[in-house]
A protein has these predicted regions:
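Active-site and NAD+-binding cores of ADP-ribose-processing enzymes
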Residues: 1-17, 48-176
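Extended catalytic/binding region for NAD+/ADP-ribose chemistry, centered on the ART fold
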Residues: 18-50
Length: 176
């Protein structure tokens, strides 16, 4: 996409679980709590649980960065007791298929309307880790600083090897 790790999507692309909404559109930035969940939510998003393969076109132009949060962020919790407080089950919000994104985006819009900086939930594809979405009109790029000591560029041999080691037990082949 050509964006920096802390640069927001201004509303381009297909609808996602929690974006897009607003007029004008609220820019969003998705993030993950760990490298594995970042890969699971992006590169492996459409790979069946039974396994599959990633082709070079799927990963060679992808990079991963790490962000450091530089201020307290108020996040709507779409997990645990946060779901209970909302009176909704994960199956109806964070675990839905894409055909229900029209519904799930409304929850994100409501969190935005209530003044939250973003939302947090358990990753659907790596449910031991948290996933995040930040609202670009509330959290600036300066609030999420790129860690200069970390990067993965999946065009580099060492990072392709890391990706391969991660994916082999998941029955996902990395085609080169």
């Amino acid at each position: 996409s050509g964006r920096l790790a802390n640069e927001y999507n201004p509303g381009k692309g297909r609808q996602t679980r929690f974006a897009f909404f607003g007029d004008p559109v609220v820019p969003v930035l998705y993030a993950a709590g760990a490298e594995e969940s970042a890969v699971a939510e992006t590169l492996l998003h459409d790979v069946p649980l039974s396994g599959g393969a990633l082709r070079p076109d799927d990963y060679l132009d992808k990079v991963m960065g790490r962000l450091t949060v530089h201020r307290h962020l108020r996040l709507a919790s779409f997990m645990g007791t946060g779901l209970r407080a909302l009176g909704v089950d994960a199956a109806d919000l964070t675990m839905t298929e894409s055909d229900r994104y029209v519904e799930t985006v409304r929850w994100s819009a409501a969190a935005h309307e209530d003044g939250f900086d973003g939302i947090v939930w358990m990753s659907r594809r790596c449910n031991t880790e948290r996933a995040y979405m930040f609202f670009g009109d509330r959290v600036g790029s300066a609030d999420l600083v790129i860690d200069p000591d970390f990067a993965r560029a999946f065009a580099l041999p060492d990072d392709i090897d890391w990706l391969t080691r991660m994916c082999v037990p998941l029955r996902v082949a990395i085609r080169r």
